Structure formats: C-alpha cells, structure tokens
Amino acid sequence: MYVKKRDGRQERVQFDKITARVSRLCYGLDMNHVDPVAITQKVISGVYGGVTTAQLDDLAAETAAYMTVTHPDYAILAARIAVSNLHKQTKKQWSLVISELYNYVNPRTGKHSPMIAKDVYECVMRHKDEFDSAIVYDRDFNYQYFGFKTLERSYLLKLDGQIAERPQHMIMRVAVGIWGDDVERVIETYNLMSLKTFTHASPTLFNAGTPQPQLSSCFLVDMKEDSIEGIYDTLKTCAMISKMAGGIGLNIHRIRATGSYIAGTNGTSNGIVPMLRVFNNTARYVDQGGNKRPGAFAIYLEPWHADVFEFLDLRKNHGKEEVRARDLFLALWIPDLFMKRVEQNGQWTLMCPHECPGLADVYGDEFEALYEKYEKEGKGRKTVKAQKLWYAILEAQTETGNPFMLYKDACNRKSNQKNLGTIRSSNLCTEIIEYSAPDEVAVCNLASLALSAFIDYENASYDFKKLHEVTQVVVRNLNKIIDINHYPVKEAHNSNMRHRPIGVGVQGLADAFLALRMPFDSDAASKLNIQIFETIYHAALTASCQLAKEQGPYATYEGSPVSQGILQYDMWNVTPTNLWDWTALKADIKKYGVRNSLLLAPMPTASTSQILGNNECFEPYTSNIYQRRVLAGEFQVVNPWLLRDLVEMGLWSDAMKNRIIAEGGSIQNIQSIPNDIKALYKTVWEISQRTIVKMAADRGAFIDQSQSLNIHMREPTMGKITSMHFAGWKMGLKTGMYYLRTQAAAQPIQFTVDQEALRATDDRVAPAHSGLKKRSPPAGTYTSIVLRENTSGPRPYAQTGVSGTSTPIGTRDVPTPASTPPPTEVPETLVQSDNRPRPLVSPAKSAGFKADLPEPESPKALATDPIVKTEDIGSPLLERKEGQNEDVDEDSQERDENIYSNAPLSEQQVAACAWNPGADPSSCEMCSG
C-alpha cells in the first residue's frame, strides 16, 4: 500500500516511519502514559491506497485527540501533529506570508483584494528582519488540540479557503496591528501573547492588521428617538456594528407601549414586540464578520414598562410565532424600588414612557420620587402585585435562561462615568457598564489575563508581581487600540475618544486554584480571589495613570469619582488588603489623572479560553468530563487536573471514566477517590451558590465595570431563584445574573456505560495517600517568562520589605512593583486517625443556602405554593386540535395572590430577607432553606 507525499511522489507505507514521526513530537510529555506505537497502530488500520501524508497527519491527530481521556498529554500531542501538518502547508517566514496576504488577487474578479492593511504591510517590510527573527515557532506546539482547531476554524487568515497563517503569525499580526513601527512594543506584546499570559478578544484576533481593523467587542446603543426615523436609524447602527463582529446591548426603555397615541398619524402604537421582531431578523441576517459568529443583540428594558409581560415571553418555545423573537437576548435593568416592592409584597405600576417621561433618565432617590409622583397622579397603565411580575420573570428564566438581571441603581451609583449622565444598559454579556446616548454609542475593547500563567510552581504560590506587570502591558495595548480602531459608526468613535474605557478580564481562575491545590470554596481560594482582582485593579490604574502623565487624562475626566479620589472599592465601602500601596497610587492619580474612565470587566471568554486551554473566566468547572465538538467529530475530554491526579494515584481506568460519566461528570459519590481530591474537584453544581455570589461580591470591589456572572442550579424552583437574586442584590452586585444555567430533570440512558464495571469501581476503596501534593506544571506550561529588564519608569507602588515570589518580568516603561508575598500561608494540618498530617481542604460548612438545597416541587412552582394535580387531556380535545389561549387571554392566569401568604410564618420570610454578610443566615428561610 502506498502513501502520496506532498511533492506528488508515492512511497510505501512504513509503520516505523509513522511511529518515529509521532515520537519526535512527544518531547516533554509523560512517556509513561503516552504511547506513540498505539497511535500508529490505529492510524495504519485506517490507511487506504493513495492516502496523502497530510491526511495521515490528520488521522494521527484525531487518534491522539480521542486518547485524551487516557492522559491529558495526548491533547498536546494531537495539537503538535496537527500543527506540524499546518507548518508543512504554510510558509515559515512571516514577512513572506504578509506579502502574500497583501498581494492577494481575487480569482473571481481579478482585482487586488488585500487581506492586510497597506500601512501594516509597509511596516512589516520596513522591519521584516526584526519581526521574522522574533517569532518562536516552537510555541505553536504548546497548544492543546481543541484550542488549535478553534484557531484553524475562525482565527487564522485563509487564502482561497486554505489556511495561510500559523498561530505565531496571527499573534505577530495582532502585535504589529496594534503597535506598528514601535518594534519594542510589538515584540513585548508578541512574547506575552505567545507565552499564553494573556490574549486579546476575538474581534482583535480576527481583524488586527486587516484593511478594516474593527477590534472592539462590545457596543452599547441607545434608541435614537421614539419614532419611525429613530427606530430605523438605530436598526442601521446595529446592522453596521454586527457586520463588523460587534456584540450589541440596546436599551428600549423609552419606546412607547402598546396602545399609546401617535400624534403624527392619529393612530396607536403596536408596542415593542413588532419592533423587536425586526431587530431579531436583522440579528439573523447580519452575522458578525462573514459567518465567524452569528449576530447578537441583547435588549434591555426596565420593569415598569407597560409591555414588560410580553417582553418576558419573547424567547419562549410555545405560543404564537408572531409574538416571539427567539434570536434576541433579553435583559432587565432593575431599579431598587422594584426589588423593595417584591420584598414587601407591594403593588407595582406599569407605565408608558410616552405618558410618564423621564424614568429611564434618573436613578436612585430621584427615580423613586418621579415614579411615585406618576403613581399618585394616576398616570400608570396598570397596577399589579410586584410578585406577579416577579413570578413571570422567574418563569421566563426557568424556561429560557433569560432575562439577564442587572441592578440599575448599583450600576449607576458605583460607576466612574456617573458624571456623564444616567447609564441605561449593559452589553451583550452583562460585564460592560458604560454611558450611552442617542449621539453616543459606548464601546469597549477587551482582553483577558490567563490567571493560570502566573503560578509559581516551585514555591507553590501566586506571582502577583508578574501579574501586575503583564496587566500594565494589557492596559497599554487596549488604550492604543482606542486610537487605531476602525469604528463602524461615528457615534462609537466620538464616545470612545471622549471617555476611553477598556475592559481587562480574566480566564482560568479555577485552573489557578487547582494548580495551587485550593478547593474553589475554601478560605484560601476566597482570599486569592480578592488578591488577584485587587492586583489587576491596582496595576490597571497604575498603567492608566502613567499614560495620563504622558498623554493627559481622558476628555471627560473632571467631575468623575476618580478625579475626586474615589476608587471602586471606596464606592463599595471596602478596605483593600495591604498587598499594594494604594495611598501612593491615589496621590499620583490626583497629580496626573487617569487615561481611561473604566478598566476592569471580566467577560465570559468562551472562545479565547478554549484557545489557551483554560477554564472560562472566573467560573468553576461545570463537569469533570465533557464533549468537545470539532469538524472531525466529538471527543471526550476529562478535566486535565483531575486526570493527572487519578493517573498518579493509580485510579484511572476505563471503569473510572465510565463511572464519572454515569455520575454526570461528578466524582463526589465515587468511594475509591479520597475526600481531599473530591473537595478539590467539586463542579459548579456541587459548590454552594452562596459561595459563588459571595466571591463575585468580594472581587466586585475591584471591578469598575461589572462581571458576567452565571448562576447554576441543578433543580431550579421559584424559591431558590428568588433567594439567589435577593442575595446578589443585597450584596451590591451590579450584574445579578447573566444566564441561569440548569440541568435536565432526567438524565438520558447511558447505553455506552458498562454497569458491571461501575459496580467494580464501587467496590474499591480509596488508597492511602498523604494528602494533596504540590502540583508540578502541566506539559506546555511556560514556568519562566523573562523579557528585557526595566530600565526606567516611575517608582514601584507595592509595599517594600516583603519576601519575593518567582521570576520577574522586566517590561518597558512598566512600573515594576516590589515583590509580594504568596497569597496564603501553608494550610493548617489536621491529624488523621493514623497520625498522618492532612491539609485542611475546605472550611466548616455554614448553614445551608436555600438556593443550594434540593426541593421536590416542579421548577415552575414556588416553594410555598400548593402542588396542583394536573389531568391528562382527553382524546376528543386532541382530535379537535384546540389550541391554548394563553397568548389571547392575558388574564388567564392572574397570579395576583401573595405567593407567600399561605405559607407558614418561617416561609413568609423568603421575600423579606434582609440578608447581609453580618447576619445569621440560618434565621432566614431565603438563606437557610
């Protein structure tokens, strides 16, 4: 049997040659568990006459990827085979690739169609020797397979459908696209990105260096006017933004409600639903940058709007199609007054913004005074029980995961842009809180820090110094993007130049905890969570202050809280730790100002975290075993940290894999796994949601925008969701909830799981082991990042006289802080029955949180509601095909009763909980369950 080589020659298939090729790519991997011969055997079984060497490489990579469930190093080996294959099909010299991309001629039109901007091409030609020599192609071999396939699918530039770039080419294109002729900055950015310490957001990776470099991720749009002209002008704005790969947050608070008078035509309004269906179709039609991602609009509405009930039904799977808009994402912009009325079981008046103007333009006490004035004047459309509307919100969230929940007053009170006016919405992913207006489209450029890259494995500590320095580089990059960005609409350009907000996020917080052997819900993790975000906020302000010293503060700086010496943690009434010298930083800000109005905005990082091989943003792992889908098929992936631990303890086998699958990705009920390992690998479904919300509030004091906080509930009920929302609101969160994530009520039958093997794993007992060991760095991890030494810059801000951590990074013009101590002391030990010391892996469990406790009722039934017995529909009714009337008769289910009135006294406390961190949660039904 023959194989066809890339030059067209044919050669007999040789088993040893394939094995040798795979073996050459196994450097640095654990050869006790990685078997090149096993891969070759499976590849040979799939060989056919005339197969090409490229196809053999694809088959070998897919084979290694399928073996990832055996050991995580197979994911790196699979990527190396795929990368090696790509390297054979692409040019090595980056300047030649750029020349080819710039000189591209469209074969259909015969016209010059450059894929690289002229100024970028000319810059590369001027500095090609420096840029070409700076690229380290070996770094391509440290991606995991699924991260590399993500790059292949959407990020690497293609010529006539064939990939022309390598991953290192893309990173250098991004660096040059941002910094141009500043060679030192280019190489600094290239090195930090290629070493996987941070990544820019997807639009930046897509478009940097191209003829239309639209590098921004988020756009916040305000309706231009409540008129046909205003609505369709806004629609065009949304289409232009979506065309350029931007996600959109649109507020419609000021669009008149159904039945409102229209003076121009002497008619009445159809309300917001028909209008939103037009926006829905635009989102479907105008995708983000040539099918890279679908168009995405989030629609924000305040809950006093008279069409709010119809709004909540837009994404439901049942009901009339003409009143549905399932491609839009829904969000509520909730004033505190509404939460108070729900808590008190009070009345809530629905109003039309045309008849009760100004409500969207004020917040806090001013909003409450105006709203109550309209109530007293009888201008409302309809008065309902606040809990009736609350029930409708929870019902929609249970069915669809929407609407998102953001608290208007917290967003405005704790914003550094409060001097600009009332903020009316967030963005698509609920982490951007910026001022928008009819003549201003708010914009945000994003990047995320890979928190797992700053682990000092040698000392089992966290390297805050390195994190501080890299954060400053990220801030400078994002600030530069504001100036070189191609804006889809002039309103976005005007806004970004005036206020200069940026969004620094994170990914891999869960990986950082696992690398340091900290359970997600431990005291040590809670402390590290605060210190990480305190470090990022301090570093971001440091860099922005230095930029202001060089270039001046942003145009609307005067009158902002920061200009008055008020930082984000001051607005939360929080005192920072002694990790950094905030007094000196405030003194410098008072002297020079800051260049950017907003700095931190932890975003979801869905795609970029997959590229870098991290868990998403600040979330726990959702499962310890899951599916990854690529064009080649579906692959099972096991949490790589868990897999290494189980392999080292001799517990990993097919039977163990099947047991974890049978447990839905959990290891908590597997007797053979030690308890400290179980504590380390709790999934998000097994961690108290109170812990998740509390950690969000802890880091919130150092996040001047907001955060994309998902809520996970295994079996959601109205009582649980109510508990969660009120806890977040009381703790001062800006984003109370991004998505509500739930699990299916029933698991599918697992035909592929061997039940006999499961019983075998049940019979095994946990092996004796001496507690959690210090984790060594995984394959493909860069443990030492050394750039040029810092030669200039302002004095360090960190407190001096403390012990150091790991290898420093010297970066140009970045203030290098003094070394900082590790985040936590060595854990206290407990003595087990056999006198062996064992680390304390989690604190004592506090009183249960209602949202974490199982409840037997239907997800649509409140915890205090009686369970209603339902009857089967008789066959005559089915034969007559009678439809439901729920969309015709608005009053078919009034739900006007007090949803807690018939409950025992303890259960009536659910909606009236005054939960706060100092209170005893066990005294409250909402918190204790």
From Swiss-Prot:
The record marks C924, C927 as: Interacts with thioredoxin/glutaredoxin. Its EC number is 1.17.4.1. The record marks Y738, Y739 as: Important for electron transfer. Residues 868-884 have a biased composition (Basic and acidic residues). Residues 789-904 are annotated as: Disordered. PROSITE patterns: ATP_CONE, RIBORED_LARGE. GDP binds at S202, S217, N427, E431, T605, A606, S607, T608. Pfam families: ATP-cone, Ribonuc_red_lgC, Ribonuc_red_lgN. Residues 885-894 have a biased composition (Acidic residues). GO terms for cellular component: ribonucleoside-diphosphate reductase complex. DTTP binds at D226, S227, I228, K243, R256, A263, G264. The active site is at N427, C429, E431. InterPro entries: ATP-cone_dom, NrdE_NrdA_C, RNR_lg_C, RNR_lsu_N, RNR_R1-su_N, Rrm1. ATP binds at K5, R6, E11, R12, V13, Q14, F15, D16, K17, T53, D57. Under complex allosteric control mediated by deoxynucleoside triphosphates and ATP binding to separate specificity and activation sites on the large subunit. The type of nucleotide bound at the specificity site determines substrate preference. It seems probable that ATP makes the enzyme reduce CDP and UDP, dGTP favors ADP reduction and dTTP favors GDP reduction. Stimulated by ATP and inhibited by dATP binding to the activity site. GO terms for biological process: deoxyribonucleotide biosynthetic process. Residues 800-809 have a biased composition (Polar residues). The record marks C218, C444 as: Important for hydrogen atom transfer. It catalyses: a 2'-deoxyribonucleoside 5'-diphosphate + [thioredoxin]-disulfide + H2O = a ribonucleoside 5'-diphosphate + [thioredoxin]-dithiol. GO terms for molecular function: ATP binding; ribonucleoside-diphosphate reductase activity, thioredoxin disulfide as acceptor. PANTHER family: RIBONUCLEOSIDE-DIPHOSPHATE REDUCTASE LARGE CHAIN, RIBONUCLEOSIDE-DIPHOSPHATE REDUCTASE LARGE SUBUNIT. Belongs to the ribonucleoside diphosphate reductase large chain family. Provides the precursors necessary for DNA synthesis. Catalyzes the biosynthesis of deoxyribonucleotides from the corresponding ribonucleotides. This is Ribonucleoside-diphosphate reductase large chain.
